[in-house]
């Protein structure tokens, strides 16, 4: 009987000990969550898309090319520029990839406070599916093109239409998600789409044809912007890390960074192997004439 009482007492003590331990674990977990919430709120968050113009940002983040005591960089990954826009509008990011036309639209129409950090090497290509019968811009009559409105894609679409003898009008369909646009093209659900690298190479490998490219334009539209005037010390730290990443990227072939490209852009080795040579730019402000052009392009 005494032995049973002893065992029951021991079990009760053990149970109380477990309860205290669980309460401590819960309290520690809550404290950790609170610390992370505060750290996240203070972090320098960057809106990115799964495209090659974001590769310097992916590299500086994954390779820790910055002093974490000076800046805590967090990536906000989006598969559409529209989601980046929403993040900028709601103050969820301190910097974001975009294009000049989009940035000027957001400043003018949405009253978002944006400042240009740098131009980028981003280019855009118009690709048509084999089943569309489109082999050149003149064949685009009565076709449907997937794009994002109020952006470089809309500008380029207007340029294609005005610069070529197209017998009948074609139509723009707003499809914002990069992956959905590509999937629709490959499934013959749309005649043509605007893409950027690496999706351009991915689409070409699947038999789609390039009809037009932004490299034909005397205009450099790719850009990275600051949102709502982040701290100057954070801007300087981010730019220093960005320049380090650019120097590293330019010292190797693009295929050297295959793991990084596959991780963030969801492509395979075949696509990476076929990517064209890309030279990245250190931080350089967009040209004033390019900004003025973007400002006056869309109504």
Predicted regions and their residues:
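Sec-dependent signal peptide recognition
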Residues: 2-9
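Ligand-binding clefts/hinges and TM-proximal coupling segments of bilobed small-molecule sensing domains
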Residues: 19-29, 71-72, 150-173, 240-279
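Residues within well-ordered alpha helices
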Residues: 65, 160, 202, 260, ...
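An extracytoplasmic/periplasmic, membrane-proximal ligand-sensing/linker region
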Residues: 24-32, 38-44, 52, 192, ...
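Pocket-lining segment of extracytoplasmic ligand-binding domains
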Residues: 101, 171-261
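Short, glycine-/small- and polar/acidic-enriched structural segments
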Residues: 23-167, 172-173, 184, 191-197, ...
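C-terminal motif of bacterial Sec signal peptides marking the signal peptidase cleavage site
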Residues: 15-17
């Amino acid at each position: 009987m005494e032995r049973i009482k002893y065992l029951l007492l021991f079990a009760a003590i053990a149970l109380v000990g477990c309860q205290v331990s669980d309460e401590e674990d819960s309290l520690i977990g809550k404290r950790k969550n609170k610390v992370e919430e505060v750290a996240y709120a203070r972090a320098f968050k960057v809106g990115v898309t799964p495209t090659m113009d974001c590769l310097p940002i992916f590299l500086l983040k994954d390779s820790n090319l910055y002093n974490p005591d000076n800046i805590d960089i967090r990536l906000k990954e989006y598969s559409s520029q529209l989601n980046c826009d929403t993040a900028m509008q709601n103050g969820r990011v301190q910097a974001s990839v975009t294009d000049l036309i989009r940035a000027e639209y957001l400043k003018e129409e949405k009253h978002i406070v944006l400042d240009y950090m740098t131009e980028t090497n981003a280019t855009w290509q118009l690709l048509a599916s084999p089943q569309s019968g489109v082999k050149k811009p003149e064949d685009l009559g009565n076709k449907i093109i997937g794009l994002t409105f109020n952006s470089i894609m809309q500008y380029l679409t207007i340029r294609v239409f005005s610069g070529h003898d197209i017998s009948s009008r074609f139509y723009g369909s707003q499809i914002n998600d990069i992956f959905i646009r590509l999937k629709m093209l490959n499934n013959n659900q749309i005649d043509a789409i605007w893409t950027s690298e690496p999706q351009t190479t991915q689409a070409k490998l699947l038999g789609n044809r390039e009809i037009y490219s932004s490299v034909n334009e005397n205009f450099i539209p790719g850009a990275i912007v600051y949102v709502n005037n982040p701290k100057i010390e954070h801007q300087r730290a981010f730019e220093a890390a960005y320049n380090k990443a650019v120097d590293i990227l330019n010292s190797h072939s693009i295929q050297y960074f295959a793991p990084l490209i596959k991780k963030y852009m969801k492509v395979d080795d075949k696509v990476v192997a076929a990517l064209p040579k890309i030279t990245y730019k250190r931080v350089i402000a967009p040209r004033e004439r390019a900004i003025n052009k973007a400002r006056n392009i869309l109504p």
